[in-house]
Amino acid sequence: MTFSSKSPSRDNAIMMPASLGETLLREFNHLGGREILERILGEPDPRKVVEALPAGDFFWLVKKIGDDDCLPVLELATPDQWQYLLDLEIWDRDEINPAEALAWLRRLFEANRPRTVEWLLDEGSALLYRVFQTGLEVLVREEDNKEFEIPEGFFTHDGVLYLQSRDAEAEPFLRVLTGAIAAASQAAYQTLISGLASTVPSEMEEGMYRMRTVRLAEYGFLPFEEALSIYSPLSPDQLKRGGRPDTVDVSAAGEPEALVPFLPLHEAGNAGALRGALSRITDPLVLDRIRLEFAGLANQVASVQGLSRMELDSLVGMARRPPATSTSRWRK
């Protein structure tokens, strides 16, 4: 198989990371999380640096910096980067982990309160419903009920809807979060809280899981049964190349820049035959296409291993597994 580019001179949608972003990613193994954070924040326009990172590489940076130390980076991130992070961090297979969901909402809220509230009332509304269904008990005071007594432990932001956290440790954050939502839009707040009782949790979570599956499939994360195909052995006949190799267009017009991760191939290509092969590639479009395809393979491996809260060591291991997997498939 050979690669070609239709228009090497024109701007292409798949590009290398921004200059500082590229430097940080190339030095990823040699920099500590604190140093990466300081370099980003020391830039004249740190938001531009973070927004230019592919979602997958952004996730790696968050894990390198640390979940509780990454708030400055979360503040600079795009909604798509937030969503990618949540899709990988708050799910246990096909179910949302309430504690993890609340923990990451707290981090986003602390990083950028106005943007988090705006996002939760729009793209993240389903997650907000699910978190509140799990975490809150709601009482409604009728307008003509003048003898209504506020039960102990309940609080209100409007004198009509009274809330209580089911988890005492989560109560301070849920009180602040619901207050921020009420302050942003009283109508949206009342609609949200009033609708909790009429929403079927299992149906909502099933819909959220379907949407998550679609989003992650764009990055190569496949359902478990499909992902298993990466371990299927290849016969010698499948590896034979007869005649002229096919030419593959790598101009990739219309491909979002954010879909081209840098780190998976960088981690896997530091040694061995793969490193030698990559060193001979000079066309940046070809290299970007290989990055994209390789990241998909690494994410396919991750789909088999499970996607629940992967840490940095696991990410590195999964990135280095596709070359070994390819070798073992051939040997079989």
Regions found by a protein language model. Give the residues of each.
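General marker for long, soluble alpha-helical cores
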Residues: 1-76, 80-332
